[in-house]
């Protein structure tokens, strides 16, 4: 079989040929050089596929969208944008003024003001007489965006609408007609906004919220949806270490919101032994008596024989015995409408405590919830703990996060909880998480819906990504169409590692 690895790289690392590597790994799964060679191949296929997606997007002519500023100037903001917001808005405005479609990833910690940046981008599209779409991963988040943007746009000549899988009948028809006629400027919704039957008059910008629910394949599908590829802005509240950006977003430019709006009180985090559970519950009672709300997070849905973790159902029973009908429960096995109904009651203040598994991780906004208790915090990864903590601290005043830990912690768990106590900076936490857990595990848990690496060991993945990225760039520079002998071999690597959608792009191009 022809070789797709650059010969000097293969020789330098002492790697066997592909067939020999396969034979050796079958004979001895612990064969380090054979495994490293195959792991590199998988990462190389990932990097090459992303570069091809980027090249394809860059080669397509989109349309330049230049706003005249009339809508942005009319927006009455109660505060000035942060320096990071202003810088990012300039980057986006510059991208959208180009004929190549924007492909930009916006990373911003919880509360850093991504929504305002997204709104400004959507207003540029509206000023240029194009439509914008905002895609959210869940119905709750879509409705939250719709309500927030509706308030911010009050009094402006901008028409917004919402479309989710649950909208039926005349309401849905009216929305579809408004989108098709161009009467609606901004459409907000779940994946329903890109299903068949939804036709845009002139889609110029797509904003995707909470990127880790939305993989490379979906990004490619979006690019294919419009006759002229729209500009694409992708937002994530989970900071991504630079190495992992190459693996999951290698085709995108990156902006960072790395400062918080003034006046935000940092969340105070305390690590407490689960032996003191009764004292924590007593503290929760005082918190509720003060008219505040709280989240209580449990890691698993049901007790399993293998696990001594406290189930959410059992904790809800304990808290209900103490606080009565102020306690609600949401978990991953509930149906969407059922979950939404409980969340809506919590948001409306009818419930004081929301007991949850990690389904509250993404984006829910209840400013009166100023306490979060996370049970068995030592069983969660850093990025997930940070995301969960970000559910509080969304209003004025001080918020608190209590991390309940087991006894007999490992060194890694101790380091994790100590870091959570000492910093609220998501970018610091993301880099440290990479050191503590390794890239493979981090990618696997974060990028749901995105291909996980199967062969690379967590501690070797970061260096493999850097090396494979350089090699894939070299090949793409020399042989964009993958027509040479090495290019043909690289096509085979894309097929073998299930990245053949990228080969389809080559054929189409």
Regions found by a protein language model. Give the residues of each.
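Conserved pre-motif I regulatory segment
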Residues: 63-107
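Accessory helical-bundle/CTD segments and flexible terminal tails appended to RecA-like ATPase motors
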Residues: 344-354, 362-367, 372-375, 390, ...
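Intrinsically disordered or highly flexible coil/loop and linker segments, enriched in small
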Residues: 2-3, 31, 49-60, 98-102, ...
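Non-catalytic, well-ordered alpha-helical scaffold segments
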Residues: 16-20, 37-46, 357, 386, ...
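Inter-lobe coupling/hinge segments of SF2-like helicase ATPases
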Residues: 60-61, 87, 100-419, 481
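Short acidic (Asp/Glu) and glycine-rich catalytic loops that position anionic groups and cofactors
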Residues: 2-4, 22-27, 68-72, 126-129, ...
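Generic amphipathic alpha-helical segments used as scaffolds and interaction surfaces in large
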Residues: 8-16, 30-39, 79, 136, ...
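Upstream accessory/linker segments immediately N-terminal to the RecA-like ATPase cores of bacterial MutS
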Residues: 1-76, 445
């Amino acid at each position: 079989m022809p070789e797709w690895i650059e010969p000097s790289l293969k020789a330098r690392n002492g790697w066997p040929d592909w067939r020999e590597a396969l034979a050796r790994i079958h004979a001895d799964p612990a064969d380090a050089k054979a495994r490293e060679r195959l792991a590199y191949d998988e990462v190389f296929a990932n990097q090459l596929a992303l570069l091809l997606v980027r090249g394809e997007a860059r080669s397509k002519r989109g349309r330049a969208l230049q706003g005249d500023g009339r809508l942005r100037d009319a927006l009455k903001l109660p505060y000035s944008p942060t320096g990071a917001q202003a810088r990012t808005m300039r980057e986006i405005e510059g991208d959208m003024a180009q004929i190549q479609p924007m492909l930009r990833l916006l990373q911003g910690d919880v509360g850093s003001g991504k929504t305002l940046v997204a709104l400004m981008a959507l207003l540029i599209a509206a000023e240029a007489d194009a439509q914008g779409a905002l895609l959210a991963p869940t119905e709750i988040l879509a409705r939250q965006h719709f309500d927030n943007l509706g308030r911010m746009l009050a009094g402006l000549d901008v028409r917004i609408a919402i479309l989710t899988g649950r909208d039926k009948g005349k309401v849905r028809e009216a929305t579809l007609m408004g989108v098709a006629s161009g009467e609606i400027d901004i459409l907000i919704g779940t994946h329903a906004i890109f299903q068949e039957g939804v036709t845009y008059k002139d889609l110029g910008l797509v904003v995707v919220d909470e990127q880790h629910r939305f993989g490379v394949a979906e990004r490619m599908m979006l690019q294919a949806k419009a006759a002229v590829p729209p500009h694409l802005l992708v937002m994530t509240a989970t900071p991504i270490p630079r190495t992992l950006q190459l693996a999951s977003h290698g085709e995108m430019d990156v902006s960072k919101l790395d400062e918080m709006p003034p006046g935000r009180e940092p969340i105070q985090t305390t690590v407490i032994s689960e032996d003191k559970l009764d004292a924590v519950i007593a503290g929760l009672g005082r918190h509720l008596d003060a008219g505040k709300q709280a989240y209580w997070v449990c890691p698993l849905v049901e007790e399993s024989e293998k696990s001594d973790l406290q189930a959410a159902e059992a904790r809800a029973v304990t808290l209900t015995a103490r606080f009565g009908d102020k306690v609600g429960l949401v978990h991953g096995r509930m149906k969407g409408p059922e979950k939404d109904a409980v969340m809506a009651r919590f948001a409306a203040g009818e419930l004081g405590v929301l007991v949850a598994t990690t389904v509250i991780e993404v984006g829910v906004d209840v400013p009166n919830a100023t306490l979060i208790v996370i049970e068995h915090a030592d069983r969660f990864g850093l990025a997930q703990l940070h995301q969960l903590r970000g559910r509080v601290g969304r209003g004025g005043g001080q918020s608190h996060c209590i991390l309940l830990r087991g006894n007999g912690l490992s060194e890694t768990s101790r380091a994790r909880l100590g870091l959570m106590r000492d910093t609220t900076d998501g970018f610091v936490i993301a880099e440290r998480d990479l050191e503590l857990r390794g890239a493979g595990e981090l990618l696997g848990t974060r990028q749901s819906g995105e291909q996980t690496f199967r062969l690379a060991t967590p501690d070797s993945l970061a260096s493999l990504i850097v090396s494979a990225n350089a090699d894939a760039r070299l090949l793409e520079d020399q042989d964009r169409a993958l027509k040479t002998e090495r290019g043909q071999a690289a096509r085979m690597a894309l097929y073998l590692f299930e990245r053949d959608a990228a080969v389809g792009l080559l054929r189409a191009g």
